[in-house]
């Protein structure tokens, strides 16, 4: 091992398959004194699979827990309205008419503190199914590859739904 000791890495939570995590937080404990975070990060990235990268390693208090100390979690769901091979793995192609204004009115109903038990996996052992949603909205956006290559894009060719909450239930 890189640290010459057995460590356990604990992540902030689960992600479903085909879900990409950005700003994912994890923690581990080590007995290595004065760990050179930059050198350690370089070595970790050299052995991690291509699809995983560590951007920063920071010291934390011994009480810190990546999963239970998370203050919020955010998910983004992407829709593209026209054929775009660059978006296939990250976005859903949907070519039928959409009313973004109505979609945002519906999304607003998710805001606030609610019991989301109807969305959780049957048989879940959650202590509570109460979640507080602080943001839920649809927005038009232009992906980087479209902007860089100068492709023409209408206002609603690409949509993103962002939902932010203090927690999410499994399969929610």
Where are these regions (language model features)?
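Structured-RNA-binding interfaces characteristic of tRNA pseudouridine synthases
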Residues: 2-172
């Amino acid at each position: 091992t890189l640290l010459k000791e057995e460590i356990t890495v604990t992540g902030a939570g689960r992600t479903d398959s085909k879900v990409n995590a950005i700003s994912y937080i994890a923690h581990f404990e080590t007995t290595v004194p004065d760990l050179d975070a930059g050198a350690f990060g370089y070595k970790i990235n050299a052995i991690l699979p291509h699809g995983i990268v560590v951007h920063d390693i920071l010291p934390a208090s011994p009480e810190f827990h990546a999963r239970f100390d998370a203050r919020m979690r955010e998910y983004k769901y992407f829709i593209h309205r026209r054929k775009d091979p660059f978006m296939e793995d990250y976005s859903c192609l949907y070519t039928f008419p959409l009313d973004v204004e109505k979609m945002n009115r519906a999304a607003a109903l998710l805001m606030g503190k609610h019991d989301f038990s109807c969305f959780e996996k049957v048989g879940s052992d959650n202590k509570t199914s109460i979640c507080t949603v602080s943001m839920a909205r649809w927005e038009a956006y232009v992906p980087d590859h479209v902007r860089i290559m100068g492709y023409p894009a209408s206002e609603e060719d690409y949509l993103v739904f962002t939902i932010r909450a203090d927690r999410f239930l499994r399969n929610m």
